[in-house]
């Protein structure tokens, strides 16, 4: 654990990784807290508001039982177990069962369609999947195309042909199971990337990935954990940000996690949930924060101690709104599926600079480099790289040695994100390499323009892309969701264009403005710029 301090440089100097040779996430996140005291592990809130508390003692018993179910089905160490569920008790339970048995779990977004599901299950060779009725409706149409998939466990509802009932199978199994003695470097989970280019790639992570996340989680959540902490995120528990920024670090530290299955994010319902369950630590993706600001949320019962966000730069306007609404700073972090939480913020360690991702996490050596792994001078644009080895980094891309090789250069993992580091050590995200807009000889990153647009009083959300231009190579186009009380018009579009011209530069203003009711998003709340580019 990090020692609480206000001296960032000393915190980094004194940090030492302590990765034990033998390590299993089930033991670390469950068994060591299952002491008979009944301390809560998961607080699940159903759609109707009813809640169920599950203790670490119960979670240990349940996960041992389901590990026996997996073993009885003939699965062995290294086999893959897929989880196609939204936030629920069954999700961490099944992960822990797979970890116990030395198997590899595969989280799958509940919103995945048939094609996305088929690719990931076929590519991973999953032998068992745990899902619910809505997941089974999608799965049964492709089941015949998945010869390696032997077992489908159904949560809730009546088991139908081709499925097995999850809870009856678990309850009938023995609670005695000897957790496999795994090495810290043994495979534990495959998390598929969002597939911005080509098919998604499966990042194979080891048990040590949890330990690699802890320094940033502890820093960003203001030296987490502290007495009374309770953690929640609206993000799907299939994303590395929800799993390893929230769920497993909380369980590792013995902190209760609130889970809630919602059809869509409701800002006012989110505030009520946090008040009802005394949530103190949240991970709120930028989209959630923007929607909360748009809804002008307030609730006297919300008493947050820490707010973490990441995935898109927030900008000064949103930072100010969070500060005035919740009375604390929002701490942004940066990472990716392959190598997460390498950079972050903590206002007690150094001042927050709007638009910056923060500084390198203790234990991480982050640099701006070229594509050969050579370090670039401070202030220069380049690829954000993380020096290796680092316990948070994936083992490899599953069954994809060529992509694995391309992910590294010299001593560094290449994030594929462009950024710069200023003289004070702050990192600034510029864009994905494939998001850069080339216009009239300039290379322009969309994030700075989007940040500027959010400062205009009419703009609730925005996304900026490049569209083909025979003269300029690309022209800048802004897709804008308006705040309540504003109506789309040519006059407003011109006003917004002039606003960016004045605030940024003449070559950075959007020559085209498209008003829209919503923006296409990934399941993790990131804007799908490629879909907007395809629309022209």
Positions of the model-derived regions?
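Conserved AMP-binding/adenylate-forming core of the ANL superfamily
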Residues: 42-96, 113-118, 167-168
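Conserved pre-ATP/AMP-binding loop-to-beta segment of ANL
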Residues: 38-40, 171-192, 199, 224-230
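Gly/Ser/Thr-rich phosphate-binding loop
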Residues: 252, 279-284, 293-352, 365
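Structural core segment of the AMP-binding/adenylate-forming
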Residues: 72, 96-168, 278, 484
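Conserved structural elements of the adenylate-forming
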Residues: 63-65, 171, 203-224, 289-293
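Conserved AMP-binding A3 loop
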Residues: 52-57, 188-215
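Conserved AMP-binding/adenylation subdomain of ANL enzymes
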Residues: 211-233, 238-280, 295
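AMP-binding/adenylate-forming catalytic core of the ANL superfamily
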Residues: 115-119, 127-132, 282, 388-390, ...
């Amino acid at each position: 654990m990090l020692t609480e301090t206000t001296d960032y440089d000393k915190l980094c100097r004194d940090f030492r990784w302590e990765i034990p040779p033998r390590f299993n996430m089930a033991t670390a996140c469950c068994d060591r807290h299952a002491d008979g005291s009944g301390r809560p592990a998961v607080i699940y809130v159903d759609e109707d508001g009813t809640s169920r508390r599950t203790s670490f003692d119960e979670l240990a018993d349940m996960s041992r039982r389901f590990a026996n179910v997996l073993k009885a089905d003939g699965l062995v160490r290294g086999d893959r177990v897929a989880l196609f569920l939204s936030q629920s008790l069954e999700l961490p339970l099944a992960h822990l069962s797979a970890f116990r048995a030395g198997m590899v779990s595969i989280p799958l977004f509940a919103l995945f369609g048939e094609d996305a599901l088929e690719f990931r299950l076929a590519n991973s060779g999953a032998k068992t999947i745990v899902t619910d009725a809505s997941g089974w409706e999608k799965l049964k149409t492709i089941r015949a195309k998945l010869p390696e998939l032997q077992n489908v466990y159904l949560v809730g509802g009546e088991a139908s042909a081709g499925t097995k009932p999850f809870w009856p199978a678990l309850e009938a199994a023995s609670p005695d199971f000897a957790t496999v003695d795994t090495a810290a470097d043994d495979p534990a989970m495959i998390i598929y990337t969002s597939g911005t280019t080509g098919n998604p790639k499966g990042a194979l992570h080891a048990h040590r990935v949890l330990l690699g996340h802890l320094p940033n989680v502890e820093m960003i959540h203001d030296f987490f954990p502290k007495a009374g902490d309770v953690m929640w995120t609206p993000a799907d528990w299939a994303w590395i940000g929800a799993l390893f920024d929230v769920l497993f670090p909380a369980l590792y530290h013995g902190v209760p996690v609130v889970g809630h299955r919602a059809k869509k994010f409701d800002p006012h319902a989110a505030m009520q949930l946090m008040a009802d369950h005394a949530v103190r630590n949240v991970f709120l993706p930028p989209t959630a924060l923007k929607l909360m600001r748009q809804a002008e949320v307030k609730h006297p019962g919300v008493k947050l101690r820490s707010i973490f966000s990441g995935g898109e730069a927030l900008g000064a306007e949103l930072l100010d709104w969070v500060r005035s609404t919740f009375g604390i700073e929002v701490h942004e972090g940066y990472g990716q599926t392959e190598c997460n939480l390498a950079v972050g913020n903590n206002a007690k360690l150094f001042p927050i600079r709007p638009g910056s991702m923060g500084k390198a996490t203790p234990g991480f050596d982050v640099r701006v480099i070229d594509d050969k792994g050579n370090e670039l001078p401070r202030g220069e644009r380049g690829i954000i790289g993380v020096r290796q080895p680092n316990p948070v980094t994936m083992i490899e891309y599953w069954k994809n040695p060529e992509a694995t090789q391309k992910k590294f250069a010299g001593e560094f993992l290449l994030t594929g994100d462009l950024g710069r580091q200023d003289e004070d050590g702050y990192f600034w995200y510029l864009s994905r390499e494939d998001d850069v807009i080339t216009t009239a000889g300039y290379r322009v990153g969309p994030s700075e323009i989007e940040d500027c647009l959010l400062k205009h009083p009419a703009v609730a959300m925005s996304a900026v892309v490049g569209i083909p231009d025979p003269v300029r190579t690309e022209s800048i186009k802004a897709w804008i969701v308006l705040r309540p009380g504003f109506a789309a018009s040519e006059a407003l579009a011109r006003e917004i264009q002039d606003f960016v011209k004045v605030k940024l530069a003449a070559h950075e203003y959007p020559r085209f403005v498209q008003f829209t009711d919503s923006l296409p998003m990934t399941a993790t709340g990131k804007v799908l710029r490629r879909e907007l580019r395809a629309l022209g």
